A protein has these predicted regions:
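Conserved nucleotide-sugar donor-binding catalytic segment
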Residues: 1-74, 82-90
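Membrane-interface aromatic/basic loop that binds lipid-linked glycans or pyrophosphate carriers
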Residues: 74-79, 93-153
């Protein structure tokens, strides 16, 4: 990511496998760093500027979405180990998907999975601020529930 800086040695020691995330390696790298409890900081000032062109990786939307889905599932499965693989997959889809194509039953499973993990917002596993994380996720899931139930009525 052009606005990120780190010591090469700190990332290299993680031996990250990018095979499943070739088109969104930066997102996968951040998930791996978090899983290894690396420290992050946001700096308010831009450190570099770059030009945008049609050939860059961010223009390949489907492949990027697949890579992000893979990394989201990895992250969610570690954040909430009590979820089944299906719950992890569906929850990650509703949390990151721009265009969500699920059946009503799948939405119900995802919402149920979210309700299950929402009750355990006290224990931070990787230094994440669970209060802030859940406030954002609450708003998002409530919005999706409202849309779904308006559509099905």
């Amino acid at each position: 990511n052009p606005s990120s800086m780190w010591r090469h040695s700190s990332i290299k020691t993680l031996a990250i496998n990018y095979a499943q995330t070739a088109t969104a390696p930066d997102f996968h790298m951040w998930v791996q760093c978090a899983l290894h409890q690396m420290k992050f900081a946001n700096l308010p000032e831009p450190l570099l500027f770059y030009r945008i062109h049609q050939g860059q990786a961010s223009k390949i939307h489907d492949k990027i979405s697949e890579s992000i889905q893979y990394s989201m599932e990895l992250w969610i499965s570690h954040l909430f180990p009590e979820l089944t693989p299906k719950e992890v997959s569906l929850l990650s889809l509703i949390l990151h998907g721009k265009s969500i194509k699920l059946r009503t039953e799948e939405f119900e499973i995802a919402f149920s999975a979210y309700d299950k993990v929402r009750s355990n917002n006290e224990t931070s596993l990787f230094g994440e601020d669970r209060e802030t994380m859940f406030s954002i996720l609450d708003a998002h899931t409530q919005f999706l529930k409202k849309l779904l139930y308006q559509r099905t009525q």
